[in-house]
Regions:
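Acidic, Gly/Ser/Thr-rich repeat motifs that build Ca2+-stabilized beta-propeller blades
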Residues: 1-92, 141-155, 203
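Beta-propeller domain segments
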Residues: 14-16, 86-203
Length: 203
């Protein structure tokens, strides 16, 4: 039986986005809706306790959507790496979050596993989460080869990417992409995006 908080929502492409194992503990990244706020949260599945909650998405809930929030996670050494995408609805407001360090959307996040265990055991109030890299659109695949981290990312209307993820890397979204903007109903303009990452000093 899953113990999910009352704010958990399946509406607008919400749901459980990834499951994380820390020892015998199972943690879920979920979509939430509460008091006109759409957000993502990490919760402990055995009791529904909240370990982390993002800031609200900037668009009004009636106009928002969780499609593109999808996530993946890996363990490397003493850290958990977790991806969090930028929801695709109303890209004019949501996409810029990938470049904004005040938000966790559009990032590869890094969490010390011992700090996560302390949070699970109620030994600390706040869970420290580091932004490992940013400028991601929909980073739905994450894997490791030896000590290197690779990410598969969905581009807009084509332009999918395979990236080597490095600390403090900036992968350019929404300023550069190999894809094409969607049309106006999603906040786009249907035009191609600047695709040259290197000349624009992005990874």
């Amino acid at each position: 039986k899953l113990d999910l908080p009352r704010y958990f929502t399946l509406q607008r492409n919400g749901g459980i986005k990834t499951i994380i194992s820390i020892g015998e503990n199972k943690i879920a990244l979920i979509s939430g809706s509460e008091n006109n706020c759409f957000f993502a949260a990490l919760i402990l599945l055995k009791n529904g306790n909240e370990l982390m909650r993002t800031k609200c998405l900037p668009e009004e809930p009636k106009n928002n959507d969780f499609n593109g929030l999808g996530s993946s996670n890996i363990h490397l050494d003493d850290f958990l790496y977790l991806t969090l995408g930028t929801p695709e609805k109303h890209v004019s407001k949501n996409s810029p979050l990938a470049q904004n360090n005040e938000y966790l959307f559009g990032k590869v996040l890094r969490i010390k596993k011992n700090e996560l265990i302390k949070k699970i055991d109620n030994q600390t109030k706040d869970l420290k989460i580091d932004i490992f890299s940013k400028g991601h659109r929909v980073p739905q695949g994450l894997t490791r080869i030896n000590n290197s981290i690779f990410n598969v990312e969905h581009g807009p209307k084509g332009g999918d990417e395979l990236n080597l993820i490095i600390k403090n890397g900036n992968y350019g979204w929404p300023l550069v992409s190999y894809g094409t903007n969607y049309l106006k109903e999603n906040g786009g303009d249907g035009k191609s995006i600047n695709f040259n990452h290197e000349l624009n000093n992005f990874n």
